[in-house]
From Swiss-Prot:
This is Multifunctional cytochrome P450 monooxygenase af510. Keywords: Glycoprotein, Heme, Iron, Membrane, Metal-binding, Monooxygenase, Oxidoreductase, Transmembrane, Transmembrane helix. Multifunctional cytochrome P450 monooxygenase; part of the gene cluster that mediates the biosynthesis of fumagillin, a meroterpenoid that has numerous biological activities including irreversible inhibition of human type 2 methionine aminopeptidase (METAP2). Within the pathway, the multifunctional cytochrome P450 monooxygenase af510 acts as a 2,4,6-trichlorophenol monooxygenase that first performs the C-H hydroxylation at the bridgehead C5 position to yield 5R-hydroxyl-beta-trans-bergamotene. One of its GO terms (cellular component) is membrane. It is an enzyme of class 1 (oxidoreductase). Pathway: Secondary metabolite biosynthesis; terpenoid biosynthesis. Pfam families: p450.
């Protein structure tokens, strides 16, 4: 979603001018109290034109502010202050140490109309959020709990390896299948359709695409000019309401259909243990008819935290593994050293597993380096201050949007020398650089609840890929290697721009291993036909 001043916004300025001036004057009084520096605002609209332009990733746009205005800078849009942190210590002081006062989310009118306020990552910091996060934490929030899902992750990784063996040119689609299969099986005990498009995957991915657009601060007219929400539907430019109603229906279907699937499977005692079935069993209210009944509050929490797991896990898993592949292609010496370690520790007669990780420090470093080199959330998700805060010499006004540049914290050459080099050994002796996961998974009480689960999915996929495949640059028709660079593309989830690469088995011995593993696989029956048809 681009930041653009639309015709609607311009036409509404006159309608809301008086209110806007009042709000602007009230809120910008704080500007005299030494808020962080930034570009000079225009009357009424403030720094609207200083928001990221269409087609540019946010973190690259805000990075320019670091050199122009310092490590903590700000802009003001229609009376709302945005504070951008390129100072890790300052960000930690505000969003870590003062998490109780800075864990709120911006009140985005458009996202709320779409129903995204039900997703865990977009909840306000309140009792509902704490209940939902506690529910997730109790099921997958620790290393021990996430270890219980390893058999599923390992099996799906093997399927990914075999799909790549048979159709290497479709590896990115195989990655999407892998991520969806893991999350849906763990969350709902649902087996996806592998011979075509799965209806549940399609539905939830549609919801995630909408989320990415809806949750960009001040990108929608009703967020930058809130007064227009009081205008009638017939007023020019109110089409955003039709979009919001459509997206809300998609969100509700994405939450309801798989939840209903689990309940029906449990009623027939045909369910697979999953996040949803485990919680239903824990919160079930006994009844004479043996139906699966839970309180309305528990049902809402189970239903929406479940779909939130997909929102947080699937897209980010694909993005980070794609970044690993980019790093391997750009720095071929990493592939060589990783394969030497795998061959020495594991051998070449089986695939690596989770038990091998502690003996594969270089491969473990590849996973750490991926989270650092191209973080999935380079600006995190926006926090909001709930009261005036002091940050060093600056005042952060109540209601400010807080944007930490996680990308810079993880690419600061003072912390990570040669930051644009993909260098897994930086976490080993004698370098011992800081573990990037402490930053990459977010701040304070908004940190990713499924971080151990996500990291495990990435590890098992990458280590098994490297064990049997060479990953290298593609060649053109003249046999010359095609150069690869890491290019950013805009979006809430950071992923590499498309690039060409080649994946092929390492040797005939590895081909034989893959064929043996393939012969041992038991076909899986899809649950797609058991879903109730969606009306969306």
């Amino acid at each position: 979603m681009a930041y653009e001043l639309s015709t609607l916004q311009l036409s509404c300025v006159a309608f809301v001018a008086f209110m806007a001036v009042l709000v602007f004057r009230t809120r910008t009084r704080n500007l005299k109290q030494n808020v962080p520096p930034g570009p000079r605002p225009l009357p009424i609209i403030g720094n609207f034109f200083d928001l990221p332009p269409k087609g540019q990733p946010e973190y690259l746009h805000w990075f320019k502010h670091k050199d122009a205005y310092g490590p903590v800078s700000s802009i003001n849009v229609m009376g709302t202050t945005l504070v951008i942190f390129h100072d890790k210590d300052a960000a930690h002081a505000v969003m870590g140490k003062k998490a109780q006062k800075t864990s709120a989310r911006p009140q985005l009118n458009f996202a709320q109309l779409c129903g995204f306020e039900n997703f865990l990552i977009t909840h306000q910091y309140n009792d509902k959020y704490r209940l939902h996060r506690k529910m997730v934490h109790q099921e997958i929030g620790t290393k021990g709990l996430s270890a219980g899902f390893r058999p599923i992750q390992e099996q799906e990784s093997i399927r990914f390896i075999l799909q790549t063996f048979n159709r290497p040119d479709d590896i990115l689609q195989h990655l999407k299948t892998l991520a969806a299969a893991i999350v849906l099986k763990i969350t709902y005990g649902y087996s996806i359709e592998r011979k075509g498009q799965d209806p549940l995957v399609e539905l939830i991915e549609h919801a995630m695409e909408n989320l990415s657009q809806a949750f960009v601060p001040l990108a929608w007219a009703v967020d930058s000019v809130p007064a227009i929400k009081y205008l009638p539907d017939w007023f020019p430019g109110m089409s955003y309401r039709k979009t919001a109603r459509k997206w809300r229906a998609i969100n509700e279907a994405a939450a309801e259909l798989p939840y209903d699937f689990v309940k029906r499977q449990m009623a027939h005692k045909a369910h697979q243990p999953s996040y949803v079935s485990n919680l239903l069993e824990k919160h079930m209210i006994k009844s004479e008819d043996n139906k699966i009944n839970v309180s309305a509050a528990d049902e809402e929490a189970i239903k929406w935290t479940a779909v939130s797991l997909y929102a947080a896990g699937s897209d980010s898993t694909v993005a980070i593994i794609h970044s690993v592949i980019c790093g391997l292609v750009m720095f071929p010496e990493v592939v060589t050293r990783a394969q030497e370690e795998i061959d020495r520790v594991v051998g070449s007669d089986r695939l690596p597993n989770f038990d091998d990780r502690t003996n594969l420090p270089y491969v473990d470093g590849i996973i750490k380096e991926a989270w650092r080199w191209n973080p999935v959330g380079p600006m995190g998700l926006t926090h909001k201050s709930e009261e005036d805060l002091v940050c060093g010499e600056y005042l952060i006004p109540k209601g400010s949007y807080l944007l930490p540049s996680l990308w810079w914290f993880l690419n600061d050459p003072k912390e990570y020398p040669e930051p644009r080099v993909f260098k897994p050994e930086r976490y080993m002796e004698p370098f011992n650089h800081p573990d990037p996961s402490e930053i990459a998974f977010g701040y304070g009480r908004r940190s990713c609840a499924g971080r151990y689960f996500a990291d495990a999915s990435v590890y098992i996929t990458v280590v098994q890929l490297l064990a049997v495949f060479n990953v290298r640059k593609a060649r053109d028709d003249q046999g010359n290697e095609i150069p690869v660079t890491l290019q950013a593309i805009p979006g809430m989830v950071n992923r590499p721009a498309p690039f060409q690469f080649k994946v092929e088995p390492r040797s005939q011995h590895h081909i034989d291993l893959l064929r043996r593993i393939e012969s041992e696989q038991i076909p899986e029956v899809s649950h797609a036909s058991l879903l109730k048809p969606s009306t969306v």
